Amino acid sequence: MILIIYAHPYPHHSHANKQMLEQAGTLENVEIRSLYHLYPDFNIDVAAEQEALSRASLIVWQHPMQWYSVPPLLKLWMDKVLTHGWAYGHGGTALHGKHLLWAVTTGGGENHFAIGSHPGFAVLSQPLQATALYCGLKWLPPFAMHCTFICDDDTLQAQARQYKQRLLAWQEVNHG
């Protein structure tokens, strides 16, 4: 099962993420957990989140990039849900062997993340990759949708279909 942990503080303002979720939602065996919908008060149900993670073979962290990082509720989710003795540390093997895909949208162009005046995209992914590896997850190459503020609907739809194809390809290789 693919579990999408979706974290967007303003989901109604994001055409890109909405289209990505719509495309992913057409696939079989996909569960979408919208953190800002489930936890508007930031009071995370750790047991429910761990149970959902236990059922997944592929975990997707989908969110807009905010200040070169994750939205605050996703960071809190990581702090609360990925606990010692469950996700890492002595006895913490619940996530071992599962795959993790980082699916991120950005307002800036891909060249904005080239090494130079701004950090490279690979550098920005390092904290998430380190978290994944520390929890025994298998890090997959990220899926990034850039320029989402200025893309027309056709471009956003095409990129959202690429996202769906990426998930479908993973399903075909890992479950069939």
From Swiss-Prot:
InterPro entries: Flavodoxin_fold, Flavoprotein-like_sf, K_H_efflux_KefF, KefG/KefF
Any one GO molecular function term: NADPH dehydrogenase (quinone) activity
Residues where FMN binds: H8, S14, H15, A16, N17, M65, Q66, W67, Y68, T105, T106, G107, G108
Subcellular location: Cell inner membrane
Main location class: membrane
Subunit: Homodimer. Interacts with KefC.
GO cellular component entries: plasma membrane
A GO biological-process term: potassium ion transport
Taxonomic placement: Bacteria, Pseudomonadati, Pseudomonadota, Gammaproteobacteria, Enterobacterales
Family listed: Belongs to the NAD(P)H dehydrogenase (quinone) family. KefF subfamily.
Cofactors (names): FMN
Keywords: Cell inner membrane, Cell membrane, Flavoprotein, FMN, Membrane, NAD, Oxidoreductase
HAMAP family documented for this protein: K_H_efflux_KefF
Database matches in Pfam families: Flavodoxin_2
Enzyme Commission numbers on file: 1.6.5.2
Alphabetical list of Gene3D superfamilies matching this protein: 3.40.50.360
Role this protein plays: Regulatory subunit of a potassium efflux system that confers protection against electrophiles. Required for full activity of KefC. Shows redox enzymatic activity, but this enzymatic activity is not required for activation of KefC.
NCBIfam families with a match to the protein in the record: PRK00871.1
Membrane topology: Peripheral membrane protein
Protein name: Glutathione-regulated potassium-efflux system ancillary protein KefF
Enzymatic reactions: a quinone + NADH + H(+) = a quinol + NAD(+); a quinone + NADPH + H(+) = a quinol + NADP(+)
